[in-house]
C-alpha cells in the first residue's frame, strides 16, 4: 500500500486535542486531482460539517490546475467526503452532544485514490497550548542532551 501525503494540517494538532481518526474518500473533479498530484493543497482553515446525512469538507484550498484553466474549478468549493453511514451517524451524534468538532488532518493518495484523514477533535484552551509547547521543548532539550552521549 503506497501512500503519498499531499498536505497536512499542522494547525489542527496545535489547536485541537485529537480524539478519533477516520479515513474518508473525497469527491473531486479531474483538474482537482491533477492539482493535488502536484501538491497544491492547503488545509489550514478547513473544517468538516455534516449536512443531511452527508459529510462535507469546507475551505480546503486546492489550487487551479494551470493546463486545465479552461475547465477550472473553484479553489475553495465544498467537497463531499465519502464515509460509511455508520461512521457519519457516529460522528454526528458525538458532535451534537459533546460540543466536539471534525477537522481534516491530511490529504493523501492511497493506491491511486485521494483520501482525507479526518479527526474528531476538542478545542484546546490557551493554557493547554502553552503546556503542550513547554512539553515539546523539554523533550527536544532532553533528546539534544542525550544525542552526543549515547554511542553504540
UniProtKB/Swiss-Prot annotation:
PANTHER family: SSRA-BINDING PROTEIN, TMRNA-BINDING COMPONENT OF TRANS-TRANSLATION TAGGING COMPLEX. Required for rescue of stalled ribosomes mediated by trans-translation. Binds to transfer-messenger RNA (tmRNA), required for stable association of tmRNA with ribosomes. tmRNA and SmpB together mimic tRNA shape, replacing the anticodon stem-loop with SmpB. tmRNA is encoded by the ssrA gene; the 2 termini fold to resemble tRNA(Ala) and it encodes a 'tag peptide', a short internal open reading frame. During trans-translation Ala-aminoacylated tmRNA acts like a tRNA, entering the A-site of stalled ribosomes, displacing the stalled mRNA. Belongs to the SmpB family. Signal peptide: none annotated. GO terms for molecular function: RNA binding. GO terms for biological process: trans-translation. It is found in: Cytoplasm. The keyword RNA-binding applies. It comes from the Bacteria. This is SsrA-binding protein. It comes from Sulfurihydrogenibium sp. (strain YO3AOP1). The lineage of its organism: Bacteria, Pseudomonadati, Aquificota, Aquificia, Aquificales. Keywords: Cytoplasm, RNA-binding. One of its GO terms (cellular component) is cytosol. Its main location: cytoplasm. The keyword Lipid metabolism does not apply.
